[in-house]
Amino acid sequence: MSTEIQTELHQAVELRRNFAIISHPDAGKTTLTEKLLLYGGAIHEAGAVKARRAQRKATSDWMAMEQQRGISITSTVLQFEYQNCQINLLDTPGHQDFSEDTYRTLAAADNAVMLIDVAKGLEPQTRKLFEVCKLRGLPIFTFINKLDRPGREPLELLDEIEQELGLQTYAVNWPIGMGDRFKGVFDRNKQQIHLFERSAHGSKEARDTTVELGDPRIEELLEEDLYYQLKNDLELLEGVGPELDLDLVHQGKMTPVFFGSAMTNFGVELFLKYFLNYALKPGVHISSVGEVAPTYPEFSGFVFKLQANMDPKHRDRVAFIRVCTGKFEKDMTVNHARTGKIVRLSRPQKLFAQERESIDVAYPGDVIGLNNPGVFAIGDTIYTGQKLEYEGIPYFSPELFATLRNPNPSKFKQFQKGISELREEGAVQIMYSVDEAKRDPIMAAVGQLQFEVVQFRLQNEYGVETILELLPYSVARWVDGGWEALNKVGRIFNTTTVKDSMNRPVLLFRNEWNCQQLQGDHPELKLSAIAPVFSSQTVE
C-alpha cells in the first residue's frame, strides 16, 4: 500500500464518527436529531416534529405516512460536518413496532446514543434496543432529555440505569434546575456553568453564557437555591460516582451521561462536542477472512438497508451501504460476494433524508446510497481485492401474522412487484404456505403498524388496494437443519409449517406453550427465534 493512500485513509478514519439514536417513542428523538443537524450547519432552522403543526415538516420524517402521523417509521441516514468531523447519524424509527428495522441499522453503527425522557426514565423499547446494542458491543452515550419539563431526580435516573442495565454511569454534565426553572448545565470536566437563553421554539442555536464555578457573577445570574442544590449534588457525585474510563465506555460497560433539552437546544451542542471526543472512530469488522481494519487498502462494505421509492417522482430503489474499509470511488467496479458478479457502482449518492447529492469518494464509517436495480439484498457484501464477506444481518422472530389478498386481478403485477420490493426492503417479512393452492402471501411482523405501513404503501406507491386477514399465531421458529431435519421428525401437531422468502421452513405457533410442547415431544428438532444467517444468502 502506498504511503499516500495509507495517510489518506488514516486521516479520513480519524475524522469520522458514526452513531444511531435509540429511544422509546416520544422521548424526543426526531427533535434531538434536528438540533444536532442545526448545530452541524446541515439545516438553518429546525422544523417542528409534529406533522400537524403549521411549521415545516421534520427533516428526517419524509415518507408520506410519517408526515401524516408525525412519527418516524423508516431509518434515514443523515450526514453532516461539525468541527471538521464527518458525522453519519443513522436515524432509527422511534415507534415500538419497528425494532427489526432498527436492528438492521444498528448493524451499521459504531456508537449508540440512548435518549431518555427525564420524566419517564427507562422504558420498554429503550431496554429492548439496549439489549441489541449490548449484543453488538456498541458504546452507549446517554442523553437525558426534556429537562425543560418537570421530571424525576437526576440521581434516581443514574441509579436506574446502573441497576436495570448493568452499566456504570458517569455524568459529564449536571442540570441546574428543572421544568420552567431549568437554567443550564454544569460541565464537570471543565468546572464551568453553562447558562442558556431560550430561542423562539428552539429553532435557532441557544445562546450560552459560560462562567467558572467560583465566579462571583454566579450570584447575579443564578437563584440562590439552585446554586445551593447544584453544589450539594456535585458533592454527592464526587463522593459516590466512578471516574470516567473511556476503555470501559468503548467496551459498552460505562455510559457517559448528559442532561439537556432538545426542544430548547439546552445542552445539545455541549453533548455533541464531548461525543466527538469520546466516541469510537470506525473500527475493525469481522469477516470471513478474520478482522479487517478500516485502513485496509481494498474497498469493502455491506448493505444494511434497502429503500424503494424514496422519491415519489422517480420510482427508484436505493441500497444503503456502510463503507467498512478502503476508499470508495465513483464508477468503481466491485465484486458482489453473494452472486460472484462484477458490479459497476455508478451514480453514488450522499444521503440526507429524502435529499441526495452525487458524491465522488467515501471512506470507512460513511454511508452511501446506490441505485439498486434488483442487484442487492440486505446483508450483501461488496469488495475489491481478496474475497471477503461480512456476517449477514439476521431476521428476528415476528409476533404478528396476516394473509394479504389482492381482490383486483387486473392489479396482479403491481401487487406482486410491491410485495417483492417491500420484502426486499425489510418493511415486513413475507412467508408462504407449503400448500401450493394457497398463494396469498403471509405477512410476518413485530408490530401492527408494519401491516398498516405495507397496506398504505401498496395503495400510495403501487396503486393496489388490499385486504388483510389476521392469523392466530404469535410465535415463529426457524428449523435448524432445514427441510431435511423437519422431514425426519414426521408428523407434528399444534403448529403450521410455512416457508420464508429463502424457502426455509418456519413453524408458526398460536402461543409459546405450544412451541415448548413441540420441543418437549421432539428434542431432536432444534428451533431458533433468529433466522439462520448466511453471508451469501441465495433466494430460491
UniProtKB/Swiss-Prot annotation:
Domain of life (superkingdom): Bacteria
Pfam families: EF-G_D2, GTP_EFTU, RF3_C
Residues annotated to bind GTP: 23-30, 91-95, 145-148
Compartments reported by the entry: Cytoplasm
Transmembrane segment boundaries: none
Annotated keywords: Cytoplasm, GTP-binding, Nucleotide-binding, Protein biosynthesis
InterPro entries: EF-G-like_DII (IPR053905), EFG_III/V (IPR035647), G_TR_CS (IPR031157), P-loop_NTPase (IPR027417), PrfC (IPR004548), RF3_C (IPR032090), RF3_dom_3_sf (IPR038467), RF3_GTP-bd (IPR041732)
S-S bridge residues: none
Residue ranges constituting the tr-type G domain according to the UniProt record: 14-283
GO CC terms of this entry: cytosol
Any GO BP: regulation of translational termination
GO molecular function: GTP binding; GTPase activity; translation release factor activity, codon nonspecific; translation release factor activity, codon specific
Function (record text): Increases the formation of ribosomal termination complexes and stimulates activities of RF-1 and RF-2. It binds guanine nucleotides and has strong preference for UGA stop codons. It may interact directly with the ribosome. The stimulation of RF-1 and RF-2 is significantly reduced by GTP and GDP, but not by GMP.
Family: Belongs to the TRAFAC class translation factor GTPase superfamily. Classic translation factor GTPase family. PrfC subfamily.
Name of the featured protein: Peptide chain release factor 3
